[in-house]
């Protein structure tokens, strides 16, 4: 398959789980990892079956009510229904202890499971890496990771991938190993700086990466899919993906 035939890929965005079919059809065929912010929202999203949307099961670390709703049984059930566990992680806006308790439980239950994890780390980059050092997971994707160069190197050594967006600095984007890069919009957050008009709109990000990596735009698009194919193969996630995405990754 030509890189020009690959649809846009967005590995971290937010879409309301009651989105309509026509609204999804307006997203240009983009493959989107749609995060949820609470277990209740994740359970609602699990009822859907959309060929281009991978619905996550999340507990956003900035939402205290979401953290208290995290249970071992709930995570075990989620890991059988969701390919993506996210948005999860740590945030500096709320107390650390409940966040760590929820994250450690999620990492424990998901150990060895065929899922990918989309991890938030605002203001807690070092503490998040400590948690992943104690409980590593082959499917860890660090969403909008604003750590230092040393922390990026540490995360890469742990096997982490990085979902990046156009609001990140050229310097930080250049620090991340090219083979670990995945695209995101984090829509609807920071639309002015990401320039994403919709979930899956990675046009400006791909322009930035084309200039930064000195690659043609088609090669950047192909790179995203090659990296995702490697990640899903090593985590045994590939058989669980929607058929259309499996075909796309099989051509990488």
Predicted regions and their residues:
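Mid-domain alpha/beta scaffold segments of enzyme catalytic cores
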Residues: 1-252
């Amino acid at each position: 398959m030509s890189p020009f035939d690959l649809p846009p890929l967005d590995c971290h965005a937010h879409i309301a789980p009651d989105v309509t079919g026509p609204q999804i059809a307006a997203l240009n065929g983009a493959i989107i990892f749609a995060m949820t912010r609470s277990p209740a929202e994740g359970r609602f999203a699990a009822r859907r079956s959309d060929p281009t949307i991978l619905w996550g099961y999340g507990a956003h670390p900035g939402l205290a009510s979401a953290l208290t709703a995290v249970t071992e049984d709930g995570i075990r059930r989620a890991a059988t229904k969701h390919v993506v566990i996210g948005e999860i992680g740590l945030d500096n806006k709320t107390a650390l202890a409940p966040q760590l308790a929820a994250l450690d439980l999620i990492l424990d239950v998901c150990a060895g499971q065929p899922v990918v994890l989309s991890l938030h780390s605002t203001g807690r980059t070092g503490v998040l890496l400590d948690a992943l050092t104690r409980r590593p997971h082959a499917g860890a994707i660090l969403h909008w990771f604003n750590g230092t160069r040393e922390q990026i190197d540490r995360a890469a050594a742990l096997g982490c991938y990085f979902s990046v967006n156009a609001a990140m600095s050229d310097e930080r984007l250049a620090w991340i190993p090219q083979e670990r890069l995945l695209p995101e919009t984090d829509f609807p957050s920071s639309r002015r700086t990401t320039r994403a008009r919709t979930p899956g709109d990675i046009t400006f990000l791909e322009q930035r990466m084309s200039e930064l990596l000195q690659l043609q735009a088609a090669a950047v698009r192909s790179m995203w899919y090659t990296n995702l194919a490697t990640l899903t193969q090593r985590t045994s996630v590939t058989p669980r993906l929607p058929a259309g995405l499996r075909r796309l990754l099989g051509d990488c």
